[in-house]
Regions:
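Glycine-rich N-terminal segment of FAD-binding domains in flavoprotein oxidoreductases
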Residues: 61-64, 70-134, 148
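Short, structural beta-strand-to-alpha-helix junction motif
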Residues: 142-143, 150-157, 173-175
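C-terminal segment of N-terminal export signals and the immediately downstream linker at the start
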Residues: 12, 31-62
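Loop/turn elements at helix/coil->beta-strand transitions in domains of secreted/extracellular proteins
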Residues: 55, 103-107, 164, 233
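FAD-binding subdomain of flavoenzyme oxidoreductases
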Residues: 162, 167-269
Length: 273
């Protein structure tokens, strides 16, 4: 039997309060239903999952690829040892991984570029659902659609080739998914808002394996939650549609001052800004 939070998300359009309760449950690991009889996945089970993935990329303990695959941006979390790292190339892969995790009651972590400073991109004994292979990019009218695995420098390079801009962060190797779902502060934020303010639609895979496109007209509460209402805890994002602006001349500058002048600088900055 699925828990109430998972059932609520699967019935269509949840209320905003239901969504928030679901987010708390997700953070506590309550979106995994009761385990099937038996122990954890066998070698045959892992092999079956590997065959299911469109990428056929699955890194397991003992394999040559595992050490590199489990590493995150921050070496503070090198002690984490996931049971497996699955590289997903399309939403159906994410659905398959979630089904696998439900079957064997494995903790799940989503990973784009692995920059989480809290270590939320990994977990010992769990399944890492890595979306870094999802890097598609297409330009529409006033918007772009981009895969959740795209890093910022790649995203900005693709935008610049079309003379476009989207407000975002300044670290080139940060993943777009974590940035957008967490807010996204950058040099264009004063003019155009946070990255999350510019999300027009997000494709996510929910805990029951459903692939949903969330926008103001469809699954609007989940759309609201993905734009700052829950830190990405309501599903695994696979694609974003983001509002674009025509690229204009941008002036960047850096200020430095002696510590003794910090109070005056802050006061002057507040008056100017």
């Amino acid at each position: 039997m699925r828990p109430a939070t998972m059932t609520a998300l699967g019935r269509g359009e949840p209320g905003r309060r239901t969504v928030l309760v679901g987010g708390v449950a997700a953070g506590a690991g309550l979106l995994i239903p009761r385990a099937y009889p038996g122990s954890g996945p066998t070698s045959a089970d892992w092999a079956a999952l590997r065959r299911t993935l469109s990428t056929h990329e699955l890194s397991l303990p003992g394999e040559r690829s595992y050490r590199r695959a489990r590493e995150l941006f921050d070496p503070r979390f090198d002690a984490l040892h996931p049971a497996g790292i699955a590289y997903c190339g399309k939403p159906a892969d994410v659905s398959a991984c979630l089904s696998f995790a439900v079957r064997f009651r494995l903790p799940v972590r989503a990973r784009s570029a692995g920059h989480s400073y809290a270590g939320w991109s990994s977990v010992t004994g769990g399944l890492i659902i890595d979306v870094s292979r999802m890097r598609h990019f297409s330009v529409g009218t006033g918007a772009v659609t981009v895969g959740a695995g795209t890093d910022l420098i790649s995203f900005y390079s693709q935008l610049a080739a079309h003379g476009l801009a989207v407000p975002g962060g300044s670290c080139p190797t940060v993943g777009l998914a974590g940035l957008a779902l967490g807010g996204g502060v950058g040099v264009l934020s004063r003019q155009y808002g946070l990255t999350s303010d510019n999300i027009e639609a997000v494709e996510i895979v929910t805990a029951d394996g459903s692939v949903l496109t969330c926008d103001p007209a469809s699954h609007s509460d989940l759309y609201w939650a993905c734009r700052g209402g829950g830190g990405g805890n309501f599903g695994i994002a696979t694609s974003f549609t983001l509002r674009t602006r025509r690229l204009r001349e941008v002036v960047l500058f850096f200020l430095s001052w002696p510590w003794s002048q910090a109070s005056r600088v802050v006061q002057a900055w507040q008056s100017w800004a």
